[in-house]
Regions:
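Ferredoxin-reductase
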Residues: 2-85, 138-140, 163-165
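FNR/FR-type flavoprotein reductase catalytic core
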Residues: 72-173
Length: 173
Protein backbone atom coordinates (compact mmCIF):
# COMPACT_ATOMS: atom_id res chain seq x y z
CA UNK A 1 0.00 0.00 0.00
CA UNK A 2 1.29 3.45 -0.88
CA UNK A 3 2.32 5.96 1.75
CA UNK A 4 0.65 9.38 1.55
CA UNK A 5 3.12 12.29 1.46
CA UNK A 6 1.49 15.64 2.23
CA UNK A 7 3.27 18.49 0.45
CA UNK A 8 4.70 21.07 2.86
CA UNK A 9 6.41 23.29 0.27
CA UNK A 10 7.05 23.57 -3.46
CA UNK A 11 9.79 25.89 -4.71
CA UNK A 12 11.41 26.54 -8.07
CA UNK A 13 15.05 25.41 -7.94
CA UNK A 14 15.74 26.52 -11.54
CA UNK A 15 13.54 27.53 -14.47
CA UNK A 16 12.49 23.88 -14.96
CA UNK A 17 13.34 22.13 -11.67
CA UNK A 18 11.09 21.90 -8.61
CA UNK A 19 12.12 21.29 -5.01
CA UNK A 20 9.24 19.52 -3.27
CA UNK A 21 9.18 19.03 0.51
CA UNK A 22 6.71 16.59 2.08
CA UNK A 23 5.85 15.19 5.44
CA UNK A 24 7.81 12.05 6.29
CA UNK A 25 6.05 8.82 7.31
CA UNK A 26 7.61 7.27 10.42
CA UNK A 27 8.24 3.89 8.79
CA UNK A 28 10.13 5.12 5.70
CA UNK A 29 13.67 3.76 5.40
CA UNK A 30 16.19 4.78 2.74
CA UNK A 31 19.81 5.87 2.37
CA UNK A 32 21.40 8.83 0.59
CA UNK A 33 21.35 8.16 -3.15
CA UNK A 34 18.20 6.05 -3.23
CA UNK A 35 14.97 6.83 -5.07
CA UNK A 36 11.27 6.09 -4.71
CA UNK A 37 8.41 5.27 -7.04
CA UNK A 38 6.09 8.26 -6.66
CA UNK A 39 2.70 9.13 -8.10
CA UNK A 40 0.29 12.03 -7.66
CA UNK A 41 -2.77 11.50 -5.46
CA UNK A 42 -5.26 12.78 -8.06
CA UNK A 43 -7.73 10.98 -10.33
CA UNK A 44 -6.00 9.45 -13.38
CA UNK A 45 -2.54 10.02 -11.85
CA UNK A 46 -2.43 7.60 -8.87
CA UNK A 47 -1.03 4.75 -10.98
CA UNK A 48 1.39 6.85 -13.05
CA UNK A 49 4.53 5.97 -11.07
CA UNK A 50 7.81 7.76 -11.72
CA UNK A 51 11.17 7.33 -10.02
CA UNK A 52 12.35 10.38 -8.08
CA UNK A 53 15.48 10.54 -5.92
CA UNK A 54 15.33 11.54 -2.26
CA UNK A 55 17.34 14.74 -1.87
CA UNK A 56 16.76 14.82 1.88
CA UNK A 57 18.74 12.71 4.32
CA UNK A 58 17.23 9.71 6.12
CA UNK A 59 17.64 11.57 9.43
CA UNK A 60 15.74 14.68 8.24
CA UNK A 61 12.26 15.31 9.65
CA UNK A 62 10.77 15.69 6.16
CA UNK A 63 11.30 14.25 2.68
CA UNK A 64 12.67 16.32 -0.19
CA UNK A 65 12.70 15.68 -3.92
CA UNK A 66 14.41 17.74 -6.63
CA UNK A 67 12.57 17.08 -9.89
CA UNK A 68 13.07 18.31 -13.44
CA UNK A 69 9.78 19.17 -15.13
CA UNK A 70 8.85 18.69 -18.77
CA UNK A 71 5.71 20.80 -19.41
CA UNK A 72 5.70 20.02 -23.13
CA UNK A 73 5.23 16.29 -22.42
CA UNK A 74 1.91 16.75 -20.59
CA UNK A 75 2.86 13.93 -18.22
CA UNK A 76 3.59 13.44 -14.54
CA UNK A 77 6.20 16.19 -14.22
CA UNK A 78 3.86 18.64 -15.93
CA UNK A 79 1.19 17.69 -13.37
CA UNK A 80 3.67 18.41 -10.57
CA UNK A 81 3.62 22.04 -11.74
CA UNK A 82 -0.10 22.20 -10.82
CA UNK A 83 0.40 20.98 -7.23
CA UNK A 84 0.28 23.22 -4.19
CA UNK A 85 0.96 22.98 -0.47
CA UNK A 86 -1.46 20.50 1.10
CA UNK A 87 -1.72 18.26 -1.97
CA UNK A 88 -0.53 14.67 -1.65
CA UNK A 89 1.98 12.45 -3.41
CA UNK A 90 1.96 8.66 -3.10
CA UNK A 91 5.15 6.75 -2.28
CA UNK A 92 4.96 3.19 -3.65
CA UNK A 93 8.42 1.89 -2.75
CA UNK A 94 12.10 2.69 -2.22
CA UNK A 95 14.88 1.33 -4.41
CA UNK A 96 18.36 1.98 -5.76
CA UNK A 97 21.97 1.04 -5.18
CA UNK A 98 23.74 4.38 -5.68
CA UNK A 99 25.82 4.93 -2.54
CA UNK A 100 29.00 6.68 -1.44
CA UNK A 101 31.95 4.29 -1.75
CA UNK A 102 34.84 6.60 -1.07
CA UNK A 103 36.50 9.77 -2.26
CA UNK A 104 36.55 10.37 -6.00
CA UNK A 105 35.00 12.07 -9.00
CA UNK A 106 31.23 12.39 -9.26
CA UNK A 107 29.96 12.88 -12.83
CA UNK A 108 26.43 14.17 -13.43
CA UNK A 109 24.41 15.70 -16.22
CA UNK A 110 21.38 17.90 -15.53
CA UNK A 111 18.84 16.30 -13.20
CA UNK A 112 21.15 13.27 -12.99
CA UNK A 113 22.75 15.07 -10.06
CA UNK A 114 19.86 14.21 -7.75
CA UNK A 115 21.40 11.10 -6.12
CA UNK A 116 24.51 13.14 -5.37
CA UNK A 117 22.55 15.94 -3.67
CA UNK A 118 21.81 13.74 -0.66
CA UNK A 119 25.23 12.09 -0.77
CA UNK A 120 27.01 15.47 -0.62
CA UNK A 121 24.63 16.62 2.15
CA UNK A 122 25.62 13.54 4.15
CA UNK A 123 29.34 14.10 3.51
CA UNK A 124 28.99 17.73 4.58
CA UNK A 125 27.07 16.81 7.73
CA UNK A 126 29.70 14.18 8.60
CA UNK A 127 32.61 16.56 7.86
CA UNK A 128 33.90 14.18 5.16
CA UNK A 129 33.68 16.17 1.91
CA UNK A 130 37.44 15.75 1.56
CA UNK A 131 38.87 16.04 -1.95
CA UNK A 132 35.74 14.81 -3.73
CA UNK A 133 35.12 16.43 -7.10
CA UNK A 134 31.90 17.07 -9.01
CA UNK A 135 31.94 17.31 -12.81
CA UNK A 136 28.51 18.69 -13.70
CA UNK A 137 27.30 19.02 -17.29
CA UNK A 138 24.32 21.18 -18.26
CA UNK A 139 23.01 22.85 -21.39
CA UNK A 140 23.10 26.41 -20.01
CA UNK A 141 24.10 28.28 -16.86
CA UNK A 142 20.41 28.64 -15.96
CA UNK A 143 20.13 24.84 -15.79
CA UNK A 144 22.70 24.37 -13.00
CA UNK A 145 21.01 22.94 -9.91
CA UNK A 146 22.33 24.26 -6.55
CA UNK A 147 25.30 26.02 -8.13
CA UNK A 148 26.00 28.31 -5.13
CA UNK A 149 25.88 25.40 -2.70
CA UNK A 150 28.41 23.34 -4.66
CA UNK A 151 30.72 26.31 -5.25
CA UNK A 152 30.79 26.92 -1.50
CA UNK A 153 31.12 23.23 -0.60
CA UNK A 154 33.64 22.11 -3.23
CA UNK A 155 35.40 25.26 -4.46
CA UNK A 156 37.77 24.43 -7.32
CA UNK A 157 36.56 20.81 -7.19
CA UNK A 158 33.19 21.90 -8.65
CA UNK A 159 33.67 21.78 -12.43
CA UNK A 160 30.90 22.86 -14.79
CA UNK A 161 30.54 22.08 -18.48
CA UNK A 162 27.93 23.87 -20.60
CA UNK A 163 26.94 22.38 -23.95
CA UNK A 164 24.82 25.19 -25.39
CA UNK A 165 26.32 28.34 -23.90
CA UNK A 166 29.85 29.74 -23.85
CA UNK A 167 30.58 31.63 -20.63
CA UNK A 168 33.79 32.71 -18.96
CA UNK A 169 34.68 30.42 -16.07
CA UNK A 170 32.81 27.44 -17.53
CA UNK A 171 34.04 24.63 -19.72
CA UNK A 172 32.23 24.28 -23.05
CA UNK A 173 31.52 21.21 -25.09
Amino acid sequence: MAEHLKIIAIEKETHDVLHITTEKPENIKYHAGQAADISINKPKWENELRAFTFTSLPTDKQLEFTIKTYPQHNGVTNQLLTLKTGDTLLLHGVFGTIAYKGEGLFIAGGAGITPFIAIFKQLERDGKVGDNKLLFANKTHADIIQEKRYKALLGKNFINILSEEKLEGFEYG
